[in-house]
Amino acid sequence: MHQLNVRSRSWDPTVVSQHEVLRLTECEKVRDQVFSLREYWKSRSPNVGFFTLGAASYLDAVERRDAYFESAREINPILRANFDWLCERVRKGFEDLLGKPVSFGDRYALPGFHIFEYFGTDISDDKPSTRAHFDMQWAHAMPGRRPEKTLSFTLPIEEPTGGSALEIWPVHCDAVRPDFDALKYAATNPSQTLRYVLGQMVVQDGLLLHAIGRSSIATPKGYRITFQGHGAKDSEGWKLYW
């Protein structure tokens, strides 16, 4: 695997950029608040410790868009009450970065948290290529129209031993044929590795082939917590959601 070069303090949809958003003490504050809200975590896999805090369109809007909106109505007030300052910092940061108005969609889920728990077991056979995807969740959350532009962001809050990463393959959704097999491509082509840094938000347009990466050790232990979401641009500006 190759280390991925990133560009900081600017954003170009053709590259991945990294931006400092939180100090380490603020990451700890967010982490502790996420732990205090464990009753609101939603288990996403019966076999591994994978949870979300927040409604995620790529999971909740796939079969029933109305169920996604209902989940958003239920959990958004909890997120606002506990992380309003974080949401606003990210929103204002994107306004500075993009030079356009940025807001949260009224009906859509606020950005939320991915939570993975690792128990120190050997996961050396884990293959990020089996998770390779393009961020096409807007097709479920906003059916019938494609946004003018898109973005996806991930803000690392907590890492297990061995850290965490993003895997990216140098292929863009708009450059492939309709019958492109993302999983087959990822399994047969090398990826580039971007190691996450706590408090530094990673931004891309979501349309580069990518996947949740691995820890740098075979037996990670602890939590991988990220604050994340997406953006969609229309004539009025950018809307952030998850």
At which residue positions do the language-model features occur?
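Generic detector of solvent-exposed, compositionally biased contiguous segments
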Residues: M1-R9, G120-R131, P190-G213
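Catalytic core of non-heme Fe(II) oxygenases with the double-stranded beta-helix
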Residues: T121-R195
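Residue-level detector of short, conserved catalytic/binding motifs and their immediate flanks
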Residues: P111, E148-L151, Q200, I225
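Short, flexible loop/turn elements at secondary-structure junctions
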Residues: L22, H114-F119, F134-M136, L155-E159, ...
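Signature of the catalytic double-stranded beta-helix
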Residues: V62-D125, A139-R145
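Catalytic core of Fe(II)/2-oxoglutarate
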Residues: V176-W242
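N-terminal auxiliary "cap/dimerization" subdomain that precedes the catalytic jelly-roll/cupin core
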Residues: M1-I75, A81-E88, K92
